[in-house]
UniProtKB/Swiss-Prot annotation:
Keywords: Cell inner membrane, Cell membrane, Membrane, Protein transport, Transmembrane, Transmembrane helix, Transport. Residues 31-283 are periplasmic. This is Type II secretion system protein K. GO terms for cellular component: plasma membrane. Type II secretion is composed of four main components: the outer membrane complex, the inner membrane complex, the cytoplasmic secretion ATPase and the periplasm-spanning pseudopilus. Interacts with core component XpsG. GO terms for biological process: protein secretion. Gene3D superfamilies: EpsJ-like. The keyword Acetylation does not apply. The gene is pefK. It comes from Xanthomonas campestris pv. campestris (strain ATCC 33913 / DSM 3586 / NCPPB 528 / LMG 568 / P 25). Disulfide bonds: none annotated. The keyword tRNA processing does not apply. InterPro entries: GspK, GspK_central_sf, T2SSK_SAM-like_1st. Component of the type II secretion system required for the energy-dependent secretion of extracellular factors such as proteases and toxins from the periplasm. Plays a role in pseudopilus assembly and seems to control its length. Interacts with the pseudopilus tip complex that is critical for the recognition and binding of secretion substrates. Residues 1-6 form a propeptide.
Amino acid sequence: MRTMRGAALVLVLWLIALLTAMIGAFALTARVEALQGSMLRNGGQAQEYARAGMEYALSRLSSGEPQARWRPDGRRYRWQMDDANVEIRIIDESGKVDLNMAEPTLLAGLVRAVGGEAGRDVRLAGAIVDWRDGDTLTQPGGGAEDRDYADAGLPYGAKDGPFETLGELRLVLGMDAELYRKLLPHVTLYSGRSRPEARFATGPVLTAMGLDAQQLLAQRDAPLGLPGSDATLGGTDTYSIESRARLSQGREAVLRAVVRTGASALPGSAYTVLRWEEGAAVQ
C-alpha cells in the first residue's frame, strides 16, 4: 500500500514538473511573439516616418520662401515628427559624377579623392570607360576589355554598353568593395552631364574637378545674404534623398531614394522614383 502511495506521489510530482515546464514554455513563447510583434510594429512605424521625411524634404525644396527652402548640397537637416527624430540629407544629382558621361580624367580624380592609390586611379577610370563604350579598344594608360576580364578569371567581360544600375560599378575590373562603398555616394546615372554642377557637388567631387573644396563648402554655409550663400538654393529636378528615422524606443529605419520631380506616370504623384532602398540597414 505504501509502495502504491509512493509511486502515486512520484507520478504527481512528475506531472507537476511537466505542467510547470509547459506553462513556462508557453509563457516564453508568448513573450517572444509579443516582442516580435512589437519590433515589427515599431519597424513599420519607423519606415513610415522615414518616408514622411522624404515627402517633407521635397516640400521644403519647392518652398516659395528662400529662408525656408532646403538646399540640395548634402547638408543634413533634422526634423521632429511625433516621437520620431528624422535626419534628412538631399543632394542634387547634377552635383555627382555621371558614370555614363564623365571623362576619364574626372573619374580618375574622383578615385584619388576618395582614397584610391596613385596609378590605380587611371587604370580604374579607363576600365569604367571601357565598360560603357561600344568598342573593344582599351583606353590609353589603362582600362579593361573582355580579354582582361578573362585573364583575371572572371566569367564575364566588359559590358560595352551604358551603365544601367550603380551596382554595375562593382563588376568593373579592379573595383573592390571598399572603394565601391566610397565612390557610391558621389556617382550617378541621372545627370546627363559630363561635368558635375559645382554648386551641389560634394567635397570629393569638387576635388576631382580641380576646385578648392574647402573654400566652396565654406561659402555654402554662409548665412543668406552673404556672397555665395544662395548658390545652392533651387536645383534641377532630380535628387537623391536619404531619410533616417529613429523612434524614442531606439528603432531605426533608413530610406534612400533618387526621385525626379514634376509630372509622373503615376496619377496624383508629384515625382518619379528612379531608385528606392529602404529598411533597417540599407547599404
